[in-house]
């Protein structure tokens, strides 16, 4: 808990961190994590959707004394941030309330507060600020009110990038998620799409992105690179033609065709299996011949079966082999 903020602090120790968390249980782990890593921060126990502040804590780091956590008075004023990093609870139910944070947009549906979190974050950004959200892929293509909100965000040139991540990255959910990057006063008039959904390694029950795979995403984003089957800068007009749907496969074709197997090699393998099968069949036929039947009717039926079975095996052996047929297939195949 708090890993994203810790990573931000590690890259920029001069940053002033304000962390907001609604879960009282998570607050305990968050404060512990900050103290153990020696990271100063303000932590607010807060319901972002209703803007209700419950408690406020400050983690202070001093060279002369241990890290101290002390509760301070709750400030009721608003704030503006240079950077917002958020991994809110996915598709959380909420009670829609129309306030200034959502001006110019429809309200997110009561069954899914994803866009309410997004609009709250954008509202709290400074004029040149950046907000990064980790959310389920549904926010990219769901319709009705969410579709209208997404359309207005695109028209207002606030969406800077859409990054698809592998599934099963987090311990609390196995669904694939995406990163949405928002910027105020953007210069670019397109949206960068990155498809990193296949970039992971298996680690027991989880998927992990290697440092090289993470750096590839970062470099691609920083350079806004177009890479075949991986990333692409898409114009707003093309997105408009797709009815403001941001589903990544609409803009990046990452399909990798499977190699066509060698027909002759497959035929050889099948033919070898057939030979082994016939050899085994003939051995079985020989064993059947050695059986002794005392009942005349049973002996007659047994002898007829052995005869038919042997003739079948012999006739199969003399037929055109699968290997020969495979050669014909390969000869006539058009690639």
Identify the residue ranges that each predicted region occupies.
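Short alpha-helix immediately C-terminal to the canonical SAM-binding loop
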Residues: 27
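Conserved SAM-binding loop
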Residues: 30
């Amino acid at each position: 808990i708090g890993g994203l903020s810790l990573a931000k602090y590690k890259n920029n120790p001069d940053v002033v961190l304000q962390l907001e968390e609604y879960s009282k249980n998570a607050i305990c782990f968050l404060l512990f994590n900050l103290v153990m890593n020696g990271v100063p921060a303000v932590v607010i126990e807060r319901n972002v959707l209703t803007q209700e502040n419950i408690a406020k804590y400050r983690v202070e780091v001093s060279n002369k004394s241990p890290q101290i956590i002390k509760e301070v008075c709750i400030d009721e004023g608003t704030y503006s941030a240079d950077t917002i990093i958020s991994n809110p609870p996915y598709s959380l139910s909420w009670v829609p309330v129309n306030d200034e944070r959502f001006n110019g947009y429809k309200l997110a549906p009561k069954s899914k507060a994803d866009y309410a979190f997004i609009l709250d974050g954008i509202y709290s950004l400074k004029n040149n600020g950046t907000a990064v959200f980790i959310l389920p892929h549904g926010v990219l293509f769901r319709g009705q009110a969410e579709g209208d909100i997404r359309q207005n965000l695109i028209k207002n040139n606030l969406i800077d990038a859409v990054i698809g991540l592998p599934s099963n990255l987090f311990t609390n959910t196995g669904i694939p998620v995406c990163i949405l990057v928002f910027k105020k006063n953007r210069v670019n008039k397109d949206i960068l799409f990155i498809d990193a959904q296949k970039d992971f390694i298996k680690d027991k029950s989880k998927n992990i992105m290697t440092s090289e795979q993470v750096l590839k995403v970062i470099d691609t984003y920083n350079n806004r690179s177009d890479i075949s089957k991986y990333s692409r800068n898409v114009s707003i007009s093309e997105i408009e033609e797709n009815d403001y749907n941001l589903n990544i496969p609409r803009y990046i074709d990452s399909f990798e065709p499977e190699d066509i197997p060698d027909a002759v090699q497959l035929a050889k393998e099948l033919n070898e299996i057939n030979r082994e099968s016939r050899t085994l069949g003939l051995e079985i036929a020989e064993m059947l011949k050695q059986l002794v039947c005392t009942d005349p009717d049973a002996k007659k039926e047994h002898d007829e079966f052995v005869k038919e079975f042997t003739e079948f095996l012999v006739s199969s052996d003399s037929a055109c082999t699968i290997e020969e047929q495979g050669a014909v297939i390969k000869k006539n195949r058009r690639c």
